[in-house]
Amino acid sequence: MRYLTAFFLICLVAAFLAAQSPSQTLAPTGTLRAIFLGGNPVQGRVDPKTGEAAGPVPDLVRELARRLGVPYKIISAPDAEVILDALKDHTADIGFLAYDPARAREADFGAAFEVMFNSYLVRSDSPIKKSADVDRTGVKVAAVKGQTQELFVSSHLKKAQVRVFQTMPPQADVERLLGSGDVDVFAINRQRSLDAQAASGSKLRALSDSFLEVEQCFVVEKGARAKLDAIEKFVAELRSSGFIKVSIDRAKLTGVDVASGKKR
């Protein structure tokens, strides 16, 4: 009898979940709450004066909310840890992160919408010409703690010394650190490398090749299968319609492409 009761309850829960609409699944409070890395131009940018978010992720959130027929709230996070915590605490419904196996132990990664390329940033007169030149004895590589690039260089570089920063230093400090030789290389995404190169005049140089290609994905709390299914369908439609490509182009992003949709 006990087993029959348990079975009956499981069936009821399954039926309830199946009956939920996409808006109830993705925005259970009635508002779609989305959290992203506000300091990562590949995801989006936040206007310091107005607080308005623009870029691929804000475009995706607004379109998803429009389709669901609900209001939205876009939350800017300083780092991946804040995003993961928000999903665990249910203070956000969906998040956006670059895929990493360590992060996938804390949250479930859904459909990828972008592929992000990553390029090392060096002093303009540096002897380092390509990514393969970096992992050498005596080379000092800087990266920001917990970011995709730091996770990669800390685990893959064998000879170079990795120096981890808590946050991304401002442009003037990046120029000073590279110019003085305190660090030889910054490991950041290609868009940031190119932005820093442009802002420096002729002081800095982004390497032309990519040391890492990473998918930018929707991310949800562990076990939220219904959310992942709804997101997969949504992203597939936007990928095929050209919506994501238009969003990337509108943001004038370099070193970013539409994800292929291949299963991970």
What are these regions (language model features)?
Residues 122-141:
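Flexible hinge/capping segments at coil-to-helix
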Residues 21, 148-168, 205-207, 236-264:
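Ligand-binding clefts/hinges and TM-proximal coupling segments of bilobed small-molecule sensing domains
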Residues 21-98, 103, 167, 241, ...:
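Extracytoplasmic small-molecule ligand-binding "clamshell" domains
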Residues 6-15:
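Bacterial N-terminal signal peptides
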Residues 81, 97-106, 152-155, 177-212:
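A ligand-binding cleft/hinge motif common to bilobed small-molecule-binding domains
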Residues 44-49, 61-71, 110, 149-168, ...:
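Ligand-binding cleft/hinge of the Venus flytrap
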Residues 38, 115-125, 190-191, 197-236, ...:
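Periplasmic-binding protein-like
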Residues 64, 86-88, 134, 174-179, ...:
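Hydrophobic residues within well-ordered alpha-helices
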